[in-house]
Amino acid sequence: MPFRFGTQPRRFPVEGGDSSIGLEPGLSSSATCNGKEMSPTRQLRRCPGSHCLTITDVPITVYAAMRKPPAQSSKEMHPK
C-alpha cells in the first residue's frame, strides 16, 4: 500500500529531544539501520515513506536557530 500524506499524525521535537511517549506504531526509540544498532548518542530515523532522515533527540532551539536568517551588521543596516 503506498504511503499517503496525512494518514499518520505529525510528530514534532520536544524540548530536550524526542519523547518516547506517543510514538507511532512500528517506531521505537532504539532505531536500527541495516540490522546494526545505532549509537545511543545520535539516533537516525526514516519517515514511513523513506523520504527524509530525522535526527532524534535534538533540542527545539536548534531547529529555531536553523530557520533564522543571518544577522546583518550595523554597517549594512545604515549605509552612509
Curated annotation (Swiss-Prot):
InterPro entries: FAM229
Family to which the UniProt record says this protein belongs: Belongs to the FAM229 family.
Organism: Bos taurus (Bovine)
PANTHER family: PROTEIN FAM229A, PROTEIN FAM229B
Name of the protein this chain belongs to: Protein FAM229B
Residue ranges, annotated region (Disordered): 1-44
